Amino acid sequence: MGLAGALAAVTADTWATELGVLASGRPRLITTGESVEAGTSGGITLTGTAAAAAGASLIALVGSSLGGQRLVISAAIGGLGGALFDSVLGATIQAIYYCPACDRQTERHPLHSCGTETVLVRGWPWLENDAVNFFASVAGALIAIGGWRLLG
């Protein structure tokens, strides 16, 4: 069950990121609702959230032969929960850097894509995007396990 939740979470996050850019409106920060630029860590759109739910549901449906409706519900909720947790971490404690040459915030460190050294502006320096993805997948697994137990 944990594996299904983790896979659903990473799929949901990927679909939200890749399809969320198709949204017509600007993303909003998950924590405050503030309008942010596309690509901002912690920014969400209705399109991206719907894509996350669809991605999580697809993984849950693939696993349905192993656990039926109980698995589908638990994994789908775990997947969406993990993806939303990823956004919360991105909006609050993920390391975000500033590139003075490009005048942009970025996740890249120590050098931005232009080759300029970046400076930490918020978050924990060790909590970069890969760590956020790891914690989000663990959250998806734990939520799915919790759902499995509650529905049992």
Tell where the protein language model's regions lie, with residue ranges.
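Hydrophobic alpha-helical transmembrane segments
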Residues: 1-152
